[in-house]
Amino acid sequence: MSDLEDEIKVLRRKVQDGEEALQRAGQYGLQLLDEKMELHNRLEEQRTEMSNVIEALEQDKYTLQREVELKIRMLESLRSEFDLVRTQQKHQMEQQQTLLERNHAVEISDLKNKVVKMKTDLEEAQLAEKQMRHKLDQQAEALNSKTEELRALTERAHETMSSEILELQVQKMELESAMATLEQELQEAQYKDEQLHLANTTLQRQLERLTEEKEEREKEAVSCYNALEKAREANQDLQIQLEQVLQQAQDPNSKGNSLFSEVEDKRAAMERQLNSMKRNYDSLQKQHVLTKQHMHHMKMQIATLMQLQGNRADPAQLERLQFMLSDKNKEIESLMMKVRELEKEKMAVKDHHPHPPSNEGELKDETYYTDLLKMQLANSKKDAEKLKEELSMARMKALSESQRVLELERKLYGTEQALKLRHSDNMKLQVKLEELKIKYTPNEVNKAQVQKRRREKFPVPEENSASVKDETTTQDTELSKNSNEKAEEKTPSHPVEKPVVIPLQSEHPTEPNPVLSRESKSVRICEDPPVCIPDAPRSPVNDSNSKNVDQTHQSSEEEENWRTEKKRKKYQQPTHVSSQKTMANECAQQ
């Protein structure tokens, strides 16, 4: 019992810590919202100031650019003359360099050919020398073997040997000589093979050298073709410059026409306006990127808060477990009291046990009554044993049912916790997916955002959802029609997954939350009378057993009611929130 109480205390502490963490997270979220609004206002002020400063600087820049252009035109004439002289000198240097490179390439190719020929001659001489040495070694070995054979024959001639052995020796010598001739032929064939292999290698080297020369000639041809193309392009550029000079000579602006000066002034004013609009567009685009990053950070915080809420223990489950624990404790205490009472009664019966009577005549007279009482007592004992067996069977069935119900509750609670964790993981993955889309395909994301206006669904109660609907319908009537028509046209090609956002807990932890009470597990105690065992002679143990049976029936009925209510409350009506952000909506989300 003490261990269970300690576990309950630890679980309560964990629940309190989780609630405190959620409260702190909510407070931090509100603080972050306030800081966000302050930063947004500051950024707006700084943006306006910077846009004004940038416009002034752009105007100064434009005037300075005009002055610089005049000076650049003065310098361009000098640079053009300098470039002409430099290009002529470069062209001459390139021609000389190409001639020298060609001469050097021809000389290098000749030297390479000579080196290759000398290498091939050297390899052939080395191979011939090697073959001759090998032949010399073989002939020396054959000479030594022949001398040894002659010496052996001379020694054997002196000895007495039969004619058959001599014939066999002669045949052996003939076979050895034939084998030696075959080996010589084989070696000559190997020498020829090596010579052919050497010739093949030399031919391959010549082929590689020829292919290299061919590639060099092709590169030279390509370089010549490129030089020809560059010359053509230079000729075209010169023709274009000549045409431009002729047009400038015929330009009426040079003659002082006032109409073209007015057009030039209007063009300059429009160019200034275009520059200012570009600067404003750049600043607004940067602000949009900052707000998008802030939205991603907020989504990550919401995902972490959802994960914390998933890790939090269910208060209804804890209350249910505590209630069952208290019932079991009461049952154990009642059983202990009954056991003590039975022990006291047993001791009292032993103390007050009647002594055997002394008179035998009185026993003989009262035998009839004692036999009758004994028969009644035996019948009552048999009935009591039968009832005990029935009660024990009923108790075992009730315990098995309660154990099965507890196991199902544990599994259901585990699946709910896993579902919450999966929701938080899904939220994080969606945020990461959006970040990757923005990182790798920002243009497509911007087009999708312009084409479609999404509505995020927040699972809030029906009363709050009705109030939110009344506030948002007035703001989003025209936009929703257009966006719905566009979405119906483009939904089959580009399906968009809508993220589910769960509202955070409020700052006040003591007040009961109606949303949590709806979503959490509820236990309803049925008021119907429990099923009772028919009347019979009861003992204190039987009374306790009947109570246990009643409690098991009641727990099973509570479990069925709880399941039906859970099935009813699975569906939760979503509320549509407009895409325009307001302070009230953001506070409600937090």
UniProtKB/Swiss-Prot annotation:
Keyword Coiled coil tagged: yes
Coiled coil, from the record: 1-401
Biased composition (Polar residues): 541-554, 572-590
Subcellular location: Chromosome, Centromere, Kinetochore
Function noted in UniProt: Required for the localization of dynein and dynactin to the mitotic kintochore. Dynein is believed to control the initial lateral interaction between the kinetochore and spindle microtubules and to facilitate the subsequent formation of end-on kinetochore-microtubule attachments mediated by the NDC80 complex. May act as an adapter protein linking the dynein motor complex to various cargos.
GO molecular function per UniProt: kinetochore binding
InterPro entries in the record: SPDLY_chordates, Spindly/BICDR_Dynein_Adapter
Protein family membership: Belongs to the Spindly family.
Keywords: Cell cycle, Cell division, Centromere, Chromosome, Coiled coil, Kinetochore, Mitosis
Region (Disordered): 446-590
Protein name: Protein Spindly
HAMAP family the UniProt entry points to: SPDLY
Entry GO terms, CC: nucleus; outer kinetochore; spindle pole
Ranges of compositional bias, category Basic and acidic residues: 483-497, 518-527
GO biological process, one term: cell division
